[in-house]
Regions:
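Phosphate- and other anionic-substrate recognition elements at nucleic-acid/protein interfaces
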Residues: 1-151
Length: 151
């Protein structure tokens, strides 16, 4: 099963498991003077380009929006809606995890900070240059999905 994992944010972490686990970060920050909607347009374009490059995607998994600051939660929720529409248009299954689920699975603690998650990802994949916590979260979420779906 080909799975794309997304940690949705202005700097969206992604991870993919075919032919072997790989990942990166997509910068969705709009250019100065652009509308805020450009973030959603960039995400849709990145998803389409990624699918065109890899071919088939069976499942997209993403982190559910959560947090204390409503503006950030709303921004991520808007990105989630882009992912859902993309999946519906392309016939791709999708699911999500709460941040605490991912943290507890990866570190044993549901309230682990970004540094701990980054350390955990680097321990699991020393051969991969994990550039930030967004990529780390996407990689760990992918591993969790593989474990849940026994891939």
């Amino acid at each position: 099963m080909k799975v794309l994992s997304l940690d949705l944010a202005t700097k969206t972490g992604w991870a993919y498991n075919e032919p072997s686990i790989n990942g990166g970060v997509w910068d969705l920050k709009p250019k100065r003077g652009s509308s805020e909607g450009m973030k959603q347009i960039k995400l849709r374009s990145m998803l389409q380009d990624f699918k065109n490059t890899v071919g088939k995607i069976d499942l997209i998994v993403y982190e559910k929006p959560a947090g204390r600051f409503m503006v950030g939660v709303i921004s991520v929720a808007e990105l989630v809606s882009v992912v859902k529409v993309f999946c519906e248009d392309e016939g791709i299954e999708y699911t999500s995890y709460r941040p605490t689920e991912i943290k507890k699975w990866a570190t044993g603690k549901g309230n682990s900070n970004k540094v701990k998650m980054l350390e955990e990802a680097r321990l699991r994949w020393p051969e991969i240059n994990i550039i930030d916590d967004n990529m780390a979260d996407a990689m760990l979420m992918l591993a969790m999905t593989q474990s849940d779906f026994v891939l």
